[in-house]
Amino acid sequence: MDQLSAHLDRGWDLAQKGDASGASACAKRALEIDPQSPEVHNLLGYTSALSGESEEALEHYRQAIALDETYLEAMLNAAEVLMHPLGEWDEAIDLCDDALEYAETKEEMADCLLLRVDALLGKGDVEEAKKCMARLPDPPFENGSYVFLIGRAYYELGETEKAAPFIEEAVRVDPSHADAHYYLGLLRDDAGDTRGAVESFLRSRALDLAKPPPAWAPSPETFAQLVRRVIQSLDALLGRWVRDADVYIVDVPGAELVVDGVDPRAMVILDARSPDEPLLPGEPVGMQARLFIYQRNVERSAGSVLSLESELSSGLEREITAVFLDRDSASPPEKHQLN
């Protein structure tokens, strides 16, 4: 193996483990060897995205595409960054269309179309997303992960009957697939199968806990400092409900809470009442709120250390709004909206 390939292989290995700084160092060493390598710029883009540097990532991906206009992987990586966190849905859709012209295998076609569906959903164009799903190639695929990805896409489109066989097959093929068990729980919950949903959610929770935290995950002490900072920086209208709350930080919701109906991947749970409500018998004076923050779930949703603060802030805002400000709303908050 030549030196360039060795640096690239090592860089991708570290990137897949979440080690953005290590992967970036490998990519920079590869760049010194060949500044005109599209593969190097693709890796640099990936490590930049992993570090939360979206604009820099996009610049590297565009450079990779400029060096190789048929570079499908760089196109799709760029589309992902355009979608999240930049929210440039139309540009992402255009890139998916460009990539589709160079897709040769069923798997490559599925990659392009599924990412296009995500962008269309982000844009709010559900009908066009459904048409896009109809263009997917038929299974089987060489990689079994596409079965789950197709099922998940159908679920996000609200087509649960189409989603069910794909999600069930994903669980059968890979019993250790945490996401597949989670979506199976959602399907069972929607179908009114409470016991089955709880079993799937508990399995998903156990599998999530069995995975090591990402390499970039902060220590519990550092995360606690971030939580305090986020609470203090909340909008005054929202922050007044939780500024004096008792805050508890754990990895994920307890199994007993999941059995009682709590989403195992919830980021935040606020157990509180309005200051105007009377005390319950035996309740201590001054007790108004308990705030539970689930670090592993926040990390999963954030995807990078630089996104932790904004993701936690958004989760807190949604939870406070749902608990206090939407109490009298005619329409209840959507299930699993924290995910």
What are these model-predicted stretches?
Residues 15, 42, 49, 83-84, ...:
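Position-specific recognition of the canonical hydrophobic site in helix A of tetratricopeptide repeat
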Residues 98-101, 172, 178, 186-213:
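TPR/TPR-like (Sel1-like) alpha-helical repeat modules
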Residues 270-314, 323-339:
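Active-site scaffold of zinc-dependent metalloenzymes
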Residues 9, 43-46, 77-78, 115, ...:
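Canonical tetratricopeptide repeat
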Residues 5, 39, 73, 108-111, ...:
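Start-of-helix register in tetratricopeptide repeats
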Residues 33, 67, 102-105, 139, ...:
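Structural marker of alpha-solenoid helical repeat scaffolds
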